[in-house]
A protein has these predicted regions:
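Short, hydrophobic/aromatic-rich segments at coil-to-beta transitions
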Residues: 190-194, 253
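Core beta-strand elements of the Rossmann-like FAD/NAD(P) dinucleotide-binding domain
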Residues: 1, 200-211
Length: 335
């Protein structure tokens, strides 16, 4: 093979499709289901990152700006090539002080401006009454109004599978439940392939490849240590927990973004397949397969949801229909 890709999540599947469509002979393996870890544990959004844009402006960070611009371009691409898995979603940002309305609108207007031709719809200001009409369960006390902007919503797991199948259609070979147990090297120490183990049968086989791509996300350090046992860790994993509530917690056609949670993060409240998704958290954690959502993180989400819903709406632990945790493969600060 020209390429052996380890990991069949969003990154691995994307690399496989890119390589296969360029005429390369590609093999891709994953020790679990395709997209079974981080890539299926998202907020179900394809977005440029409003909060990253805020950081770019406040910190004059050119790299953050470029990331937002690239993400907005990719958002439009997904909406164009896979309209059956993606769709525009208006998202309301409630404002509980009058001066926050122009502040939020300035940010979303810039977001639209950067998107340019890739924009899905123009942001607009809504009055207090219109905000409550759109989101009846929203806390009305001190509500001044709000701003609505547009982002994309996506079925992450099905998109991952679509990328894998598209890569296979263009000649790639893909196998799930197939684990890399060792990297094979030449006499000169160059990686020339890997030993694979079938997780179902235990059989092992050696695969030769001109290049090996480590696309294992938060698990990448384990693969790196197969090459260099003394390699220092480069991943600082963070847990992102989401919960789902019954569908009546949010309107069908609009999401909500709380830009100022108790600890300064943001939280989304989004309609999803007849239910409502709320999340996410951002907590340092250890790397482990199939992480379980912590009760403390679930309670944090419940508390934040209670903060921006009407006081006559009782949010109980028993309202949680499901919860999941995904690991963000954040890069360690080298300093």
């Amino acid at each position: 093979f020209d390429l052996l890709i380890v990991g069949a999540g969003a990154t691995g599947a994307g690399v496989a499709l890119d390589g296969a469509t360029r005429g390369l002979k590609v093999a891709m393996v994953d020790r679990e289901d395709f997209g079974g870890e981080t890539s299926s544990k998202s907020t179900k959004l394809i977005h440029g990152g409003v909060r990253y844009l805020e950081k770019a402006v406040k910190q004059l960070d050119w790299e953050q700006y470029k990331m937002v611009k690239e993400a907005l371009r990719e958002r439009k691409t997904f909406l164009h090539i896979a309209p059956y898995l993606t769709s525009p979603l208006p998202i309301l940002i409630p404002a509980y002080s009058w001066w926050l309305i122009p502040y939020y609108y300035a940010g979303t207007f810039l977001y639209d401006l950067i998107a340019g031709k890739q924009n899905m719809g123009n942001s607009y200001v809504v009055s207090r009454n219109k905000a409550l009409e759109a989101f009846p369960m929203l806390r009305a006390h001190n509500l001044a109004g709000g701003v609505v902007y547009y982002d994309g919503q996506q079925n992450d797991t099905r998109m991952n599978i679509a990328l894998v199948l598209s890569a296979i259609q263009h000649g790639a070979v893909a196998a799930n439940h197939c684990e890399v147990v060792a990297l094979n090297k030449s006499d000169k120490g160059r990686i020339i392939g890997a030993r694979l183990r079938d997780q179902m049968t235990g059989d092992e086989v050696d695969i030769r490849a001109k290049g090996v791509v480590n696309a294992t996300g938060p698990f990448c350090d384990a693969i790196r240590r197969m090459d260099e046992p003394t390699a220092s860790e480069i991943v600082s994993p963070s847990s992102g927990v989401h919960v789902t509530f019954p569908g009546y917690f949010s309107p069908r056609g609009m999401g909500l973004l709380d830009p100022a949670t108790s600890d300064g993060r943001v939280i989304f409240f989004l309609p999803w397949q007849g239910a409502t998704i709320a999340g996410t958290t951002d907590v340092a954690c250890k790397v482990e397969p199939h992480p379980l959502p912590g009760e403390k993180e679930i309670e944090w989400i419940l508390d934040e949801v209670r903060n921006y819903l009407n006081t006559d709406v009782t949010v109980k632990r028993s309202d949680v229909l499901s919860a999941w945790s995904g690991l963000r493969p954040l890069v360690k600060d080298p300093s």
